[in-house]
């Protein structure tokens, strides 16, 4: 692994451990050349995904870009970062297990919105406003109406014994 400080390829792993859900390996590394310490994360990648943008351009899927867009929608919201990480991992697993090597940006946006709806209503509305390119207040009203309708949908009470 190349050192982010001095670009040396001579680094050593000092500590390696799985995350709580064992989906990621966290490694603490140190550069032998400059003694810079840094952390890397290793994840399973089921397949190489290509994103088909709205303009037809194809770009490699970027998990970090997905994480950044979710974090922007969650800015100043009190959501546990671990829940965000689990949500993004679930989205990536869903995309990778879909059987297709190419996925549209629209499909990714819809999946993200499904997950955000369960995580945080405000983040859902923020993400929807960018993803759906809101232009007027009525666009926000429509999404808020969707959330209200979902909240009013009767849910079955749990069966108690």
Curated annotation (Swiss-Prot):
Pfam families to which the protein is assigned, alphabetical: ATP-cone, Zn_ribbon_NrdR
Sorted UniProt keywords: ATP-binding, DNA-binding, Metal-binding, Nucleotide-binding, Repressor, Transcription, Transcription regulation, Zinc, Zinc-finger
NCBIfam families in the cross-refs: transcriptional regulator NrdR
Functional description taken from the UniProt entry: Negatively regulates transcription of bacterial ribonucleotide reductase nrd genes and operons by binding to NrdR-boxes.
Family to which this protein belongs: Belongs to the NrdR family.
Cofactor note: Binds 1 zinc ion.
Name by which UniProt lists this protein: Transcriptional repressor NrdR
Domain ATP-cone: 49-139
Positions with biased composition (Polar residues): 1-11
Keyword check for Glycoprotein: no
InterPro entries documented for this protein: ATP-cone_dom, NrdR-like_N, RNR_NrdR-like
One Gene Ontology term of the molecular function aspect: DNA binding
Cofactor names: Zn(2+)
UniProt GO BP: negative regulation of DNA-templated transcription
Organism: Bradyrhizobium sp. (strain ORS 278)
Chain positions covered by the region annotation Disordered: 1-20
Gene (UniProt): nrdR
Zinc finger (unnamed): 3-34
């Amino acid at each position: 692994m190349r050192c982010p400080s001095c670009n040396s390829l001579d680094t050593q792993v000092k500590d390696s451990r799985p995350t709580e859900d064992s989906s990621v390996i966290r490694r603490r590394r140190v550069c032998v050349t400059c003694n810079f310490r840094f952390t890397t994360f290793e994840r399973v990648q089921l397949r190489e995904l290509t994103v088909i943008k709205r303009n037809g351009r194809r770009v490699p899927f970027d998990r970090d870009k997905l994480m950044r867009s979710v974090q922007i929608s969650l800015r100043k919201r009190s959501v546990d970062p671990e829940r965000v990480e689990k949500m993004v991992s679930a989205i990536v697993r869903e995309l990778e297990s879909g059987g297709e090597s190419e996925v549209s940006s629209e499909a990714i946006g819809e999946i993200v919105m499904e997950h955000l709806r369960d995580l945080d209503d405000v983040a859902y509305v923020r993400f929807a406003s960018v993803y759906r390119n809101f232009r007027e207040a009525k666009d926000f009203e429509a999404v808020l109406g969707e959330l209200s309708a979902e909240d009013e949908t009767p849910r079955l009470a749990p069966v108690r014994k």
